[in-house]
Structure formats: structure tokens, C-alpha cells
Amino acid sequence: MGCIHGNECAGLPIIAQLRRSAPIAGVELWLVPSVNPDGWRAHTRGNAHGVDLNRNFSVAWRRIPRSSRYSSGPRPFSEPESRVVRALVTRMTPSLSIWFHQPERNVRDADRSPQAQRYARIVGLPFLPLVTPPGTATAWTKANVRGAQAFVVELASGPLSVTQVRRHVRAVRTAAASEAGLNPAEN
């Protein structure tokens, strides 16, 4: 997922490059450039209603007021964008989801999965355990797709260099191949 917060879209070139990459035999990649097109256009964290979509999922949801930059919306899945993500994830049941954010420069996973740790090594970012905020897409995915892994890649502020994009593409492809039981070195 390239961009759930409209002002954190450095993942878009990674998604674009993955789309241009050769397919990995035996792997189905679903690439979503932006979950938040209104926020992306306005360069805001929230959507057109000012809701932080990554606080609008039902797992551990709690109401966060509209005055906060982390506004959760009036109820879980109140926003059309989070409902679309829910429908996609429910339909596709991905075994692995990677969510790009900015600007903390790390890879985070509450479960400390080997996939997330390997991703961090490939791209040269620190791995940190994720303290999961309320109502996040990653927590919802893990709770609703049996055996699913979902983690956060926090990119640096500003655009990525061509070299950085290539590293992230390699890391995504390695994670996808590994998740499918393939030899990551061959992909």
C-alpha cells in the first residue's frame, strides 16, 4: 500500500516500479498506489473528511476527536476509503501486506516477523517493534486474515533516490517470493 496518509506518499515510486517489474512466478502482487486520493491531492494526512484512515479500522478502535490530526472518524469504517480496503483485503486475503509511511526511517512490526526484519536488512533501515495505535489497517488485517503478516515501512521525508526505490523494490519482491515459499534469491 503506497499511501494511506496523503502527506506520506514516498512509497508511490516503489509501487510504480513494482508495476513495471517482471512478474514473480507463483506470486500474486496487489499494488495499491493510494488509499487516500483526496488526502494525496490536498497533501494532508486525513481524507476529505479530515479522518486519519489509519485510525478508522475496527481493531482496537477508539474515538479520537476531529480536532486531532489522528481523528478516527465517528465509528470504525465510517470512511469509504477504509471500507474499500476492508473489501479488498477480505476478498484477496493477502498473506503479506506492506504499508508505506513517512518520515521515521524504519521498519516496524508488532509481531517482529522475520519478513519485516529481512526487509529492514535489505533496505538498510532499523527494525523496531511497532506499538500499534488504535484502529490501524495492519492490526485489522492481522486480526481478520488468518496467518496474515502486515508491517509498516517508514520511509525518510522527501522523495526517494533511484537507488532507494530499487532497494525497496528488491525487498518487496524478496518478501513476496519468500512468503510464497520460493527462493527469494531467484526473484
Briefly describe each language-model feature range:
Residues 1, 7-132, 155-157, 181:
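Active-site/substrate-binding loop(s) of hydrolase catalytic cores
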Residues 109, 135-187:
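Active-site-adjacent mobile loop/cap segments within catalytic or ligand-binding domains
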